[in-house]
Amino acid sequence: AFYIFTKVKQRYLFMLKAKKGRILISEPSLSDNVFFKSVVLLTHHNDEESIGLILNHPTKINLNEILNDIPLSDLPIYIGGPVEKQSLHFIHTLGSIIPNSKQIIDGIYFGGDFDTVIQLMHDKKITKNEIRFFVGYSGWEAEQLNNEIRDDAWIVQTAKNELCMNYSTPKLWSDIIKTKKMEHAIW
C-alpha cells in the first residue's frame, strides 16, 4: 500500500498544476453531468478558490435570446458551469479595447466593461471569432480542485488561443484526449 501511495504522490508531483490560463480536461471516469467530457479554461486560481468556464458545452440558445437588438445575434452561448447560472460571462481577444479586461493567456482576456462590448457590437467592431459568451461558471473552494486533480478527475494542460476561441466545440474533448491518453480515445 505504501508503494502505491508513493507512486501516486510521485506522479502528482510531475503533473501540471492548476493555475490561471490552464485548461482542465475531464477524465472519462468523471461522470458528473455538468463536467462529463468537459474542457474548462481556468480564468482565476489562487489558494482560496478556482474559477473557470467550460469551453465545449454549447447551450441551445443564442445571444439574441438574452440581449435584444444586437449584431452577432446568432452567437451561441455556452454553459460556463453550474455556479450562478443566471450570470453572463465572456472571453475575448480584444485586450485593452475592452476596459477592465483581465488577461488569462497571451491573446485571451476574461470579462471587462460590458457596455463597451455592446457598443463594439453595434459598431460591428467585434467578430464571432473574437468573443465567446457563457452562462454560469465553474468554481472550486480552496484545495478542492487540487484534490480532484490528485484524484485523477482532471488532466491539466496549458491553454492555447485557438483552443479557447477558434475550435469546433463538439469534438474538443475527444481530440484533446486523443493527444493526451490514447487509451481514452474511444470515449
Where are these regions (language model features)?
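A short aromatic-anchored loop/beta-hairpin motif
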Residues: M15-F134, S138-W187
